[in-house]
């Protein structure tokens, strides 16, 4: 079989997308496709027509044709089989068999066509392999990116928490009439300057310019007491580094205390048997209340680095009362899991894979029950003259959770300037480039389960939706845990470590 070209065309012969597998000019392929409708005989049910030089093998698809142009000595049976594969590929990338949809996904189709045919000859591939090849999906890359993003979020959350502690310490010192920490040892002539510098002035970091904002000016004087300790300098350098990478940090005017600790979270101490428990939530709520849809997916990934612990069983504790659906891996003994809540292989003599992440249990929860929402967000915009007063509240309904690095993103009207902030729990950032107000909360837990933000800006109520939320938690929502690991032979306990992550896939208030 020698395939010259594959094309999707209209019934009038107009080419929408065409891929030539041999050298052929544009004029030549357009001429062949333009002549194709005139050669068809509507009185016969053949799916091919021939000319003196080429053969057309075609299949109608609603108002379009899938056409293969081959040499006359090609195998017609192989041509028809290849045509069926081409026809099955198109619906994989196009939702409708229409000209606009085909044009929009033309490059995806061309890439898929190249996987089917190479240099005019059919490749031995099926539909699933074509999808895999074109997506170029890499599980290792996804895992690496997820781990890196988690570490970055934890570092930022820890930095914000330390900054908040320093601000609170300065406020307490001012309230008691003492000097702010980090400014001791001033002479009498420098007391007033030190007090002024110690005042907490919240600033809005705008991202209109890509240049890094200069560091706040520091008090100068001959006294040696103005020098900070080494730890304070490390924290300053870390914050400056984050700014240079484009991260907008809420800062206070004045020096940081020497009590600042190391910001980066310590690495997880992985045992030879390590479990990763990950959950992702996708949630959509209405602005007037009510849960439109909530879907949560979770998985336990097992990683074994020592071959002597490859034949083990995991003891799972499921305290979920919401009706979550559980599903074990096909190689896991389902009867053992149902009867004793243990995860083990069907064949006890076999071992789990070594040095690779293996998904052994996954679960799914889908609901429209409003009481299942972990974090409720209420946004109340009200027009007041030429401006709009917006009040946003959050409340943690699932008090067993501790949400870290919470960011509530409120869209703003463009071209109206920065919002005027009233009362706020936590911190905020105004991203003028993306027209967003980001409400940042380092931690939301049972002790800090509710808060509010008030601001004013010109606009209409619809301008402030959809509100989006992101967070991360080290405690999973469905409360499914591995409590014990034992060996198959002898039932002796095995040391193991666990890493739990609860992430947001989509969290919107429309």
UniProtKB/Swiss-Prot annotation:
It comes from the Eukaryota. Belongs to the adaptor complexes medium subunit family. Delta-COP subfamily. The coatomer is a cytosolic protein complex that binds to dilysine motifs and reversibly associates with Golgi non-clathrin-coated vesicles, which further mediate biosynthetic protein transport from the ER, via the Golgi up to the trans Golgi network. Coatomer complex is required for budding from Golgi membranes, and is essential for the retrograde Golgi-to-ER transport of dilysine-tagged proteins. PROSITE patterns: MHD. This is Coatomer subunit delta. The gene is ARCN1. It is a peripheral membrane protein. CDD domains: AP_delta-COPI_MHD, Delta_COP_N. It comes from Gallus gallus (Chicken).
């Amino acid at each position: 079989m020698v395939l010259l070209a594959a094309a999707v065309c209209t019934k009038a012969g107009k080419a929408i997308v065409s891929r030539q597998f041999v050298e052929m000019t544009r004029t030549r392929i357009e001429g062949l496709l333009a002549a194709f409708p005139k050669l068809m005989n509507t009185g016969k049910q053949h799916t091919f027509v021939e000319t003196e030089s080429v053969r057309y093998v075609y299949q109608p698809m609603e108002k379009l044709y899938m056409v293969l142009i081959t040499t006359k000595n090609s195998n017609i049976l192989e041509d028809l089989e290849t045509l069926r594969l081409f026809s099955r590929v198109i619906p994989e990338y196009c939702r409708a068999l229409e000209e606009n949809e085909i044009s929009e996904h033309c490059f995806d189709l061309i890439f898929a066509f190249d996987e089917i045919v190479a240099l005019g000859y059919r490749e031995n591939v099926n539909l699933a392999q074509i999808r895999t090849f074109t997506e170029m999906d890499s599980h290792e890359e996804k895992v690496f990116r997820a781990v890196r993003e988690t570490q970055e979020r934890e570092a930022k959350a820890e930095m914000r928490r330390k900054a908040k502690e320093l601000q609170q310490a300065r406020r307490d010192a001012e309230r008691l009439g003492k000097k702010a920490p980090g400014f001791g040892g001033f002479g009498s002539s420098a007391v007033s300057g030190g007090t002024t510098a110690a005042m907490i002035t919240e600033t809005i970091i705008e991202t209109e310019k890509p240049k890094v904002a200069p560091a706040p000016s520091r008090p100068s004087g001959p006294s040696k007491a103005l020098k900070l300790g080494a730890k304070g300098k490390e924290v300053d350098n870390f914050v400056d580094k984050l700014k240079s990478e484009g991260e907008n940090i809420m800062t206070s005017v004045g020096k940081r205390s020497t009590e600042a600790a190391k910001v980066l979270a310590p690495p997880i101490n992985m045992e030879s048997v390590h479990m990763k428990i990950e959950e992702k939530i996708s949630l959509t709520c209405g602005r007037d209340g009510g849960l439109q849809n909530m879907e949560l997916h979770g998985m336990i990934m097992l990683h074994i680095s020592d071959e002597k612990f490859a034949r083990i069983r995991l003891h799972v504790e499921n305290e979920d009362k919401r009706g979550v659906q559980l599903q074990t891996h096909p190689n896991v003994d389902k009867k053992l899991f149902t009867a004793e809540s243990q995860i083990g292989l069907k064949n006890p003599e076999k071992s789990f894979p070594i040095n690779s992440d293996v998904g052994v249990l996954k679960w799914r929860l889908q609901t429209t029950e409003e009481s299942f929402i972990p974090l409720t967000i209420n946004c109340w915009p009200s027009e007041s003259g030429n401006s709009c007063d917006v009040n946003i509240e959050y409340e943690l309904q699932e008090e067993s959770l501790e949400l870290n690095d919470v960011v509530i993103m409120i869209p703003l009207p463009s071209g109206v300037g920065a919002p005027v902030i009233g009362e706020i729990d936590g911190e905020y950032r105004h991203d003028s480039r993306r027209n967003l107000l980001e409400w940042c909360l380092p931690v939301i837990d049972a002790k800090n389960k509710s808060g509010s933000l008030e601001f004013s800006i010109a606009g209409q109520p619809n301008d402030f939706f959809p509100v989006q939320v992101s967070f991360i938690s080290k405690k999973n929502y469905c409360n499914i845990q591995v409590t014990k690991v034992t060996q198959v032979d002898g039932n002796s306990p095995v040391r193991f470590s666990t890493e739990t992550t609860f992430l947001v896939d989509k969290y919107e208030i429309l």
